[in-house]
Design a protein with these regions (language model features):
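Transmembrane alpha-helical cores of Major Facilitator Superfamily
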Residues: 19-27, 267, 271, 305
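Hydrophobic/aromatic positions within or immediately flanking transmembrane alpha-helices
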Residues: 105-109, 266, 300
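A gly/Pro-rich, aromatic-decorated transmembrane alpha-helix motif that marks the paired
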Residues: 27-42, 309
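Structural signature of the two symmetry-related core transmembrane helices
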Residues: 275, 295-310
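Hydrophobic/aromatic residues within the transmembrane alpha-helices of Major Facilitator Superfamily
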Residues: 27, 173-177, 271, 309
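Transmembrane alpha-helical segments of major facilitator superfamily
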Residues: 205-215, 265-277, 307
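Intracellular loop-helix junctions on the cytosolic face of multi-pass helical membrane proteins
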Residues: 6-11, 15, 37-257, 280, ...
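Cytoplasmic loop-to-transmembrane helix junctions
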Residues: 9-24, 103, 295-302
């Protein structure tokens, strides 16, 4: 897909296109924690259970040491009673883990199905970008056939570009190391050290309908401001007003206390990526018009600094 932006007419749009692509990935990531929880509950319900993030680790530890007594056994017994279990604790631990394992299989099946759909879309629309689906050798062959001169990089130019790539790779590797460790650590921290209930305004962050409305409202606001067509402005303004009304309705219908599963904290990062994408696109677009847009490596560096501050 990146080859589409090798065309000089579109080269300046490459970073904006990537922002939109990355935003689309994060739309899925925003809904993934709730979807995973729903799949787990659907599978567990078959055996009369519901998902509780505190059970899997305790159940596995208990199965490793079934003769254990004391705090661990007491905690597991309390959790088992909350699930409506009145039998042997060891049987509960085994039954719960086996039932939960089925949800992992189901989750993997959903991911596989998504890949099949993605591949079908790729094949179905391949004709629309067939001209860009070529290798460097194929591009060179086409240019030679047209009698165009193929410019080859000198050894020094190649060395400079490889050095630049290695430097970017180093930065990106450390970024993703911190990114993924942060996500896993955040889930564990949420499980062990945060409240499992939200009250007041914090409930908004655990309500997907409200978060969805906020995102749509943000895009409607930008469309209202940036659009030059009166009809588009009116439609965007109407959508914005509708989202505000829906947010109010959803908020007034929230329970006084919202139960939180630890994995739901994972939806915050993609939510803010999706929410702030139009701001970043507008910012860099404005800088590009003034000829002041930073290069891609500089943007990566700024991202690393922001991540470090976080």
């Amino acid at each position: 897909v990146g080859n589409l932006y090798d065309d000089p007419r579109y080269s300046a749009k490459r970073d904006s296109a990537f922002s939109i692509f990355y935003m689309a990935i994060n739309i899925g990531a925003m809904y993934a924690p709730s979807a995973a929880t729903a799949i787990a509950n659907w599978q567990l319900k078959k055996n009369g259970f519901f998902y509780d993030a505190n059970i899997p680790s305790l159940a596995n530890e208990f199965l490793k040491n079934p003769d254990a007594t004391g705090d661990m056994a007491s905690k597991l017994e309390v959790l088992a009673n909350a699930q409506g279990w009145t039998g042997n604790i060891a049987d509960f631990a085994s039954s719960y883990i086996n039932s939960l394992a089925g949800s992992y299989h189901m989750g993997f099946a959903v991911a596989c199905f998504s890949l099949i759909v993605s591949f079908a879309i790729y094949l179905g629309f391949k004709k629309s970008f067939k001209h860009a689906d070529v290798t460097s050798k194929q591009q060179a062959a086409v240019a030679a056939a047209k009698g165009e001169k193929v410019v080859e990089l000198t050894k020094e130019q190649t060395k400079q570009r490889i050095t630049a790539l290695i430097l970017v790779f180093v930065v990106v590797i450390f970024f993703w190391m911190s990114f993924h460790q942060n996500g896993l650590t955040l889930t564990w921290f949420a499980r062990d050290y945060t409240s499992n209930a939200a009250e007041g305004l914090t409930r908004i962050g655990f309500s997907l309908p409200m978060m969805t409305c906020i995102v749509i409202a943000m895009y409607s606001l930008f469309s209202t401001i940036q659009s030059t067509a009166k009809k588009t402005k009116l439609i965007s303004g109407g959508v914005l007003a509708l989202m505000v009304i829906l947010c109010i309705v959803f908020y007034t219908n929230l329970q006084p206390s919202t139960h939180i599963e630890p994995q739901l904290f994972q939806q915050f990062n993609p939510f803010f990526v999706v929410l702030l994408t139009p701001i970043s696109v507008a910012l860099f677009g404005a800088l590009a018009k003034k000829g002041k847009e930073p290069s891609t490596p500089k943007k990566i560096g700024l991202g690393m600094l922001i991540a470090a501050c976080g």
